[in-house]
Amino acid sequence: MSPKTLYDKVFEDHIVYEDESGSNLLYIDRHLVHEVTSPQAFEGLKNAGRTVRRTDCTLATVDHNIPTISRVNFKTLLTFIDQDDSRLQVQTLEQNVKDFDVTYFGMTDDRQGIVHVVGPEQGFTLPGTTVVCGDSHTSTHGAFGALAFGIGTSEVEHVLATQTTIQANPKNMRITIDGELSEGITSKDLVLHVIGVIGTAGGTGCVIEFAGKAIEDLSMEARMSICNMAIEAGARAGMIKPDEKTFEYIKGRPLAPKGDEWEKALKYWKTLHTDDGAKLHYDIKIAASDIVPTITWGNSPQDALPITASVPDPANVSDPIKKSGMERALKYQGLTPNTPFVVIKMHKAFIGSCTNSRIEDLRAAAKVAKGHKKADNVKLVLVVPGSGLIKKQAEKEGLDKIFESAGFTWREAGCSMCLGMNPDILDPEERCASTSNRNFEGRQGARSRTHLMSPAMAAAAAIKGHFTDIREFDYVDNDEPSITIEHEVEDKELQDAVYEHEKEIIEGTPGTEAERSTTSLKMNQNSKKPNQMLIKMVPITVLPFLTGITAPLYKANVDTDAIIPKQFLKTIKRTGLKNGLFYESRFVKMPMVRCQTDFVLNVEPYRQAEILLVTGDNFGCGSSREHAPWALKDFGIKSIIAPSFGDIFYNNSFKNFLLPIRIPQDVIESKLVPVVKAGHKLTIDLPNQQIKDGETGDVLIEKFDVEEFRKHCLVNGLDDIGLTLQKEEYIQEYEAKRREKFSFLEGGSKLIKPIKGTKKSIYGNKAQEW
């Protein structure tokens, strides 16, 4: 047997069917669901009369939209969530999980929290599994040796209906961090440094495996922070091989295998590593000694530099696109070139998000805050735990009192200020020291200015009133044991809090291999019949040829937040989003009026553009929001040509019959831009994979690349779910093999103990809070 990478092993163990073109039907072990990207998916199931195939493999919670203010007086969603659109999304999820019998942690459940915190905390995330969620930071779960990636809403519906997703096979990239990290250097510094080295498009088309002694020395929570931000390097996923730390973290958690199943799982998990001699497409080595406390300065995570550095100067950059991007970023951020980072003052700080809201992060921030007060110029410091259980554990350790004594604000679990879809936002031009994962324009509020850093650095900035090198920070004392616990036991007390829900044995809950297999089989049998009857495919959109006005966009790293800002995501429909397309670029908001800018899509003839020609790399980087292709399609755009795309955006585009075409930047500039500047339309011939001058018929691009399966679907207007359900026999065959080989995965979310007052069943608890 030829040597394989960690990724290869997990991927190959989940192939249900591989067609001649190389597209793979991949089985999904774990599906996490939240309120923002699921409404349209459940609506699709209802409209087609389909069910959720594997409710035991599905777990839902609310996180993005919910307020993080105290829930002491919580009565109902109606009175607690003020924003109508946010409330509607949460209410819609609660109705959907009830209708489809999906296990759900709502706002009165201690287990509620950010999906990427809840999954590992409950033991739902396991090594060697495939994990998906309608959220780009699903890569977090790769810290366990899982293949975890974000998907769009159409794929959420696909997974709900079929428990599979159609995937091409990405390339293998390994990033080895040699040596030991210096004192005071965290996983956040490490991953920001990596992104600064390879760029936000460096991992495009790849799964990154993080390796080396520096990675092995990290705790599981720190590893999660690393994999969480793999997506910011353009990767499809990030992975770290499981080891004894991984197994110790998982053992005994509510949804982890027990007894003989644990031993069986452990035997398999210990095979999950990259073999010597395995094929790597890219093998990058970084010295741990080169990594220092790191901070971002611009509007992309790749704009990362040491805290000891100064704001970069565009005058030193020759590339016109890069120079223009830097100038725009500095203007937006209100920064002057060559200003030392350590003198830049800030207004607010945010400690939280799926990157840095775990107990280890809170302990690190509390260690800094202890005995200090926030600076007078700092208006607000939000500390938001990743789950209700983490909140309870932090309060048990007295961390909340440390934060409150320092003038910080202690909140309930949720995504909070990470993306500003809820009431936690920055005012225009406020500068924030943030432990989140993205510093895009408007990410934390209109005209907000975000700087990414570690929890300790954010807390130190809040105390000092300006960005600070944590290595030079004066701690009040070294009384570490009261708020810091050694890595070997750091999770134990939190696990006790998690296990409080699991102390009583649930009579009738399947726990043995045989019982789990029986349970899973019953679930499958119950869910197959309705979906099997609905495999008829109805052509939706046919896109063989397109001749259209082509709008040029001279910009790189156009992220999904720029394509459609977060305020337009609070919808339960797929339509009506064209007014939100490039909103911050197309409109200037003046008092009582909204004025159009000279952005290309506001200018004739490009108001009628059907093709978008982008000259810079990495179009559509960032989040998994399918709202981006929905908005483009709603405007009338049918194809985007660019040097490269964010992987999730690329997939989402095909799901919506929007054709993304990759063409090298030099070819775009030499062959396509002159034609567009001359006012000619472009013609896209999909069957022959050519691009022509729409006026003369001259062939400009002899052959562009597109996967055969995706081309077939676009040309014929075929529905992915309908195509997949035609392969029902292969799915059933895989599920039978899974019940035998991976029996420790059976039962999943349905093994959760019912909370007091809920009805018991052989599947665990029903969906809660109705």
From Swiss-Prot:
Binding-site residues, [4Fe-4S] cluster: 354, 415, 418
The record's annotation in PROSITE patterns points to: ACONITASE_1 (PS00450), ACONITASE_2 (PS01244)
Source organism, top-level taxon: Eukaryota
The record's SUPFAM superfamilies line, in alphabetical order, gives:
Aconitase iron-sulfur domain, LeuD/IlvD-like
This protein's cofactor list reads:
[4Fe-4S] cluster
Cofactor-binding details, from the entry: Binds 1 [4Fe-4S] cluster per subunit.
E.C. code: 4.2.1.33
What does the record give as its pathway? Amino-acid biosynthesis; L-leucine biosynthesis; L-leucine from 3-methyl-2-oxobutanoate: step 2/4
Q: What PANTHER family does this protein map onto?
A: 3-ISOPROPYLMALATE DEHYDRATASE, HOMOACONITASE, MITOCHONDRIAL-RELATED
Of which family is this protein a member?
Belongs to the aconitase/IPM isomerase family.
Role description: Catalyzes the isomerization between 2-isopropylmalate and 3-isopropylmalate, via the formation of 2-isopropylmaleate.
Question: What is the name listed in the Swiss-Prot or TrEMBL entry for this protein?
Answer: 3-isopropylmalate dehydratase
What is the protein's species of origin? Answer: Candida maltosa (Yeast)
